[in-house]
């Protein structure tokens, strides 16, 4: 979802990913985002599609988020995907100051900076907890495994602003089916 949005919003073909602490599930999600935005940028004939990725190793340091975002913006990034809790607030502030678009993750961040935050991918914690409990009770979960859960289970919910063209919104919705 976020990859479709980012790959269609970028004008430079340079996108940034800013995350908190890396973990296996996060890496899988960010790798997919990177793959999707590179492909969409290439399909749109944007030369040298580049994805910059940085980990703050923090969920709280807003100033560090702003610093990382400014570094990426300085390298030409015009769309930032943020998976970083409060660190993301600093990223959004830098994006707003520089006219760069943001895609938020986990919570609806659209109202934090209208015109800057183009969309958010909300993570429905209630649905994931229900999925986990159901699968645990049915004996379907094994320890030390990562499960591909999300879109089909309607755990990830895109929330768009008018910054995302209707045809891109429709593409995202079609890919969720």
Tell what function each PLM region has:
Residues 1-177:
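A residue-level marker of the well-folded mature domains of exported/periplasmic proteins
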């Amino acid at each position: 979802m976020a990859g479709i949005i980012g790959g269609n919003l970028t004008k430079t073909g340079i996108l940034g990913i800013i995350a908190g602490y890396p973990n296996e599930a996060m890496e899988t999600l960010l790798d997919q985002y990177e793959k999707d935005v590179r492909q969409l940028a290439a399909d749109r004939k944007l030369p040298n599609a580049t994805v910059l990725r940085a980990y703050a190793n923090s969920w709280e340091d807003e100033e560090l988020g702003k610093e990382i975002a400014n570094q990426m913006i300085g390298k030409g990034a015009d769309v930032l995907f943020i998976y970083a809790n409060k660190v993301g607030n600093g990223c959004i502030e830098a994006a707003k100051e520089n006219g760069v678009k943001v895609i938020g993750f986990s919570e609806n961040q659209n109202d934090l900076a209208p015109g800057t935050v183009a969309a958010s991918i909300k993570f429905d914690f209630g649905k994931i907890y229900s999925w986990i409990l159901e699968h645990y009770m049915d004996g379907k979960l094994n320890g030390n495994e990562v499960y591909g859960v999300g879109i089909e289970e309607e755990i990830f919910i895109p929330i768009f602003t008018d910054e995302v063209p209707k045809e891109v919104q429709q593409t995202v919705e079609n890919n969720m089916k």
